Each structure stands twice: as C-alpha cells, then as structure tokens.
Amino acid sequence: MDPAQKRAAFNALAVAARDQHSPSDAKRIAKRDQMLGYVRGPWEQLEDDDSTRYDTLKQAMDDAMSKILSQAQVVHRTKHLDKLLDSGRISSLFEVGFSAGGDTPGQRALYEEAWFGKGHVPPVYSALEFDGVKPKGMSMYGSTKLYLKPEVRDRVTVTIGDSLMSSDSVFPGKPGDGLGLRANPNAIKNLVDPNKSREENMQAIYESFKKYAESNFIESQIHDGVILEDIEKVVFTQPPSSFLTDKLDKLGIPWEVES
C-alpha cells in the first residue's frame, strides 16, 4: 500500500477502537460547553473591561503561535519504538489500553470528542521544540524522540501546556481558528499594549510562550495519524540497542544519539 492507503487503513482501526468508548452526545456536548466556558469567561470579562486590549491580545496570541509553528519541530516521545516500527504507526490509547498520563480510554474519549467532535481520528500527542527550546519533564513519555517531518505541522492543533491536565484553562486550537480565545488571558493580558505595533505585541507574547516552554511544554495534537513515513529522524536520549538501530537502518529512518 502507498502511504495514503496505509494511513486510511490505520486511521480506520484507531477510530473503531475509540468508538467503543465514545460518550453519549449529551455528555460530549456538556463537556465541550464546560471546557469552553472555562476559557470564555475571562475573555468575555476582558472584552467588557477593555475591548481594545482584547483585540490586541487575541491578534498577538495568534501571531505568536503562527511564528512558533513556522519554526517548530513536532516531537513525539515513545517507550515502545520496537512495537511502533513493527506496526508501522503510532497506536492510540484506545488500542494499547493505557496512557502515560494515567487517564482511561473512557476519559480520553470524552475529552477528545468534546474538543474535536464525534468521529475524529484520535490525535497523537506530542510537543514542540523551537528557537532552541526543548520541553522539560517529558521523560515520563519515553526516552526516544521521534522528530516528525515539517509537513506534519499542518495537521496539528496546540495548547499552552498539557491539554488534559490544564483542561480548565486551555482548549486545543490553531492560529486563525480561535486560539486566542481558547487560553485563559489573565496571566498575559498586560504584556500587550494597544499603542504598540503588532510586531512588538506579537514578540511580547512569543517571549512569554517561549519562557513557559523552557520549564514546561507546548503540546501539539497531531490529527490524521502518524505513520513511519511521517518520521524525519529518531533521536535516542540513552544509548540504543543494535536491535533497534538495525531496524531503523533497514527501514531507512535516520537516527542519532543526543549528546
């Protein structure tokens, strides 16, 4: 099969596995309304208090995230590289039955369908490396890093921080898709100045996001699955076995050991 056919076949398996845990429409809608309410409230208050700052901040957040995505590498951590290479793809929680984040398939299905709608392909969770920043606290997800090809960035939504752990303050989105309204503005609203240029305000928010990423991470949710053909290179943070490197060599996937 060519990559498109493989992706479609793998995605069908992922959707079928997730559908076994899908919530009712009523639960999905209620959860979506709840999570959007968490972030809408502070934005509505800001708009009432200072509509000019509201517009300036929303634009600056969109611009800053656009800049980050233009230079970022999407990086997925794994503990199961051997299984991934054998299967040809990254499998979802619904297929493997467990998550490093500790949530159950039922909990994950509720959140994902509230965020992305019913019938979506389960996203693959990763982090962004950009401008010399490498996410902290990611070892729990695995010591092997998969650097994905640049075109994968076109298929991501993002959150500032962990989407599950911070679901009361963020909601996945992308620039131009309401991102500015999907993260609590209170911590950064005073970083922008309506009297300054668009570039200056963008840079202020960019530096804030970068500082956050230096001690935490910006999460990316990759849509439409991840297959071997999406991998640009594999980086080991610990010395790998020849068993794994031989597999990578056979598949033609570049690899290196992080210094």
From Swiss-Prot:
<protein>
    <recommendedName>
        <fullName>Gene 2 protein</fullName>
    </recommendedName>
</protein>
